Amino acid sequence: GKRSEILSKLKSEVKDISLSREKVDWGIKVPWDETQTVYVWFDALINYYSATRMVTNKKDFWPAEIHLLGKEILWFHTVIWQAMLLAAGLDLPKRTYTHSFYMIDGQKMSKSLGNVISPGQLAELFGVDGSRYLIAGSFPNKNDSDIGIERFREKYNADLANNLGNLVSRVAKLSEGLEVEQNESPVIDNQVIEKINKLELDEALGHIFDTYIDKTNNYLNQESPWKLDKNDNKRKEILTVSILNLRKAAVNLAPILPQTSEKILETFSGIIKPLEKSLFPRI
């Protein structure tokens, strides 16, 4: 991976770099030589420390818990920036994480190609949590991830509208008037914590859907509580299991889909009422 790539380069000859450029009109001039301008990467990297220090009064703002960067600027951040910090006697970031690219139909996003997707455009189409799901679910943590509006639309309808949204609506409608007590509050699954800590957001979401949402859907379809009388204890038992699973799903979704998590927990607390509208309407 990226770690091996950098370690391999460091084992070969690493040459000194010049921290200034000659006859560059824009940039910070070297104080003792006006013909020289500070190399843009040198002054830009300092901002991680200096700019953050300017806007916070917290003493523990440094070192960074995690330094997130794109793969094309790996060398500058994992070698040059680290060397600068060591030279200044400052702590290194606790972790550096390098991600790959979001691609549009196999091509890099480019203003000249006009294939850029803006977060605002996504939020208008899919809502804020819908967009968070689509972006996190396609997160290019190891390899480039191919995305596009139509791909996102299909994923949104399949995973959120038809699956999660439909499941929450069905259970809420079937459970009308029911009140389910919770003996202990659900906690975030250790596997989800582990994956989020590794920034494997797509895998974290996959685990949540597999473990809680898909299994609850399958359980509900298998047990068919709608075929049973409303006062049948078996029906109440099936719906109680489904509600508890959805509460667990909501707690696990909170770091990535906070609004959705809140709505699910609100829906299944107290005396349950049917939803007025789906969490994720089809698009």
Residue ranges and their predicted role:
Residues 123, 197, 253-254:
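Amphipathic alpha-helical interaction elements
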Residues 210-283:
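Basic, alpha-helical terminal appendages of large translation-related enzymes
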Residues 102-109, 158-160, 185-191, 269-276:
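Short, mixed-charge aromatic SLiMs
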Residues 2-3, 153, 160, 201-204, ...:
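Residue-level recognition of alpha-helical structural elements
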Residues 1-177, 181, 208-209:
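Structured secondary-structure scaffolds
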Residues 74, 138, 142, 148-151, ...:
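Active-site-proximal binding-pocket segments
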Residues 120, 193, 250-251:
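Amphipathic alpha-helical segments within well-ordered protein domains
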Residues 93, 202, 247-248:
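Active-site lining segments that contact anionic ligands and/or coordinate catalytic metals
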